Structures are given as structure tokens and as C-alpha cells.
């Protein structure tokens, strides 16, 4: 499932708003820091599990 540039921007904005490091964000999404880098770049064809984790991160308060 495709993580779009829009999703990527939302992840970066939320990470900044919560004042999380990339490492902390990767742990919250349950991915490696390298995968988080791909997510934050956008246009990443993620497995369904990773896509779901990213979407859950974006909707949680």
C-alpha cells in the first residue's frame, strides 16, 4: 500500500508537534529507523502491516 507524499508530510508534522525523535517515532510506529526514513520521504510501497501502523499513528491523539 502506498505511503504518499501527503502521508509522509503528516508523519513529519506530527513527529515535530509531539517533539519526538526519529528513533522514538520509529518505535511508536513499530518500524526500523530506516523504514521510518522511507515513510517520511513518501512514495513508499509499504506492506499492509506498516501502512496500518502509520495510519494508526496519524489518527491517535
Model-derived features: where do they sit?
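Intrinsically disordered, low-complexity regions
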Residues: 2, 36, 52-56
Amino acid at each position: 500500500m502506498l505511503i504518499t507524499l501527503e502521508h509522509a508530510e503528516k508523519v513529519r508534522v506530527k513527529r515535530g508537534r509531539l517533539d519526538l525523535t526519529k528513533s522514538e517515532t520509529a518505535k511508536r510506529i513499530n518500524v526500523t529507523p530506516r523504514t521510518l526514513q522511507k515513510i517520511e520521504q513518501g512514495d513508499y510501497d509499504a506492506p499492509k502491516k506498516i501502512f496500518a501502523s502509520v495510519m494508526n499513528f496519524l489518527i491517535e491523539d
